[in-house]
Amino acid sequence: MTVEERSNTAKVDILGVDFDNTTMLQMVENIKTFFANQSTNNLFIVTANPEIVNYATTHQAYLELINQASYIVADGTGVVKASHRLKQPLAHRIPGIELMDECLKIAHVNHQKVFLLGATNEVVEAAQYALQQRYPNISFAHHHGYIDLEDETVVKRIKLFKPDYIFVGMGFPKQEEWIMTHENQFESTVMMGVGGSLEVFAGAKKRAPYIFRKLNIEWIYRALIDWKRIGRLKSIPIFMYKIAKAKRKIKKAK
């Protein structure tokens, strides 16, 4: 099958990435409606933060790829703040890990199947174990994320499992590239890149304390506890510069 066409939700263009101006509650309803309609297409959800937007601005193929998603939601306060600066305010930030958890709640109620693809074998096994304890009505299966994009062996295994959800935790751009490379081999499936969420569910990494999330500075906490992320912080000022440049361009056009 193929990916559901872009939703008719109002769009907000942030440096070429077409975000859906939606809320967590609306996204939950969208996912429930997708299953209720029994569509044979797939629902591809991208949760984009400033780092992803930055990457997309310099990688045209990736930009075109994610703009084909059924929904693109703002995973990052930087994206929401940028939308306000550009006078196209997004309604809410929708953290990917929280949207994944909402999907799992739906799957639990409906006794659905979930495939976890990503991280190391040890981490994805631990994530599945932890989630199985929390959501016993879900049928889980998993595979580590250290595979080539063209690896058909894993695809065949997933097809045999017939999941309702495939959560891909390979990090961008690989997770979105994997989804769009293989999505036509699945049907009636919600597919979403979830970055490091599997590591959080596995207990290998901790999510930021509530106060960091409340203040919308979760990214600072992640950088403080994971030195590998320090180098990635440079994407924040680059993103801010690009937004300022886009704002000046809009002013000149008026």
From Swiss-Prot:
Keywords (A to Z) from UniProt: Cell wall biogenesis/degradation, Glycosyltransferase, Teichoic acid biosynthesis, Transferase
Pathway assigned in UniProt: Cell wall biogenesis; poly(ribitol phosphate) teichoic acid biosynthesis
GO molecular function terms noted in the UniProt entry: hexosyltransferase activity; N-acetylglucosaminyldiphosphoundecaprenol N-acetyl-beta-D-mannosaminyltransferase activity
GO biological process: cell wall organization; teichoic acid biosynthetic process
UniProt EC number: 2.4.1.187
Superkingdom classification of source: Bacteria
Recorded catalytic activity of this chain's protein: UDP-N-acetyl-alpha-D-mannosamine + N-acetyl-alpha-D-glucosaminyl-di-trans,octa-cis-undecaprenyl diphosphate = N-acetyl-beta-D-mannosaminyl-(1->4)-N-acetyl-alpha-D-glucosaminyl di-trans,octa-cis-undecaprenyl diphosphate + UDP + H(+)
Keyword set includes Transit peptide: no
Pfam families reported in the protein's UniProt record: Glyco_tran_WecG
Disruption phenotype: Not essential. No teichoic acid in cell walls.
Keyword tRNA processing included in the entry's annotation: no
PANTHER family recorded: PTHR34136, UDP-N-ACETYL-D-MANNOSAMINURONIC ACID TRANSFERASE
Function summary: Catalyzes the conversion of GlcNAc-PP-undecaprenol into ManNAc-GlcNAc-PP-undecaprenol, the first committed lipid intermediate in the de novo synthesis of teichoic acid.
Family: Belongs to the glycosyltransferase 26 family. TagA/TarA subfamily.
Protein known as: N-acetylglucosaminyldiphosphoundecaprenol N-acetyl-beta-D-mannosaminyltransferase
Organism: Staphylococcus aureus (strain NCTC 8325 / PS 47)
Gene behind the chain: tarA
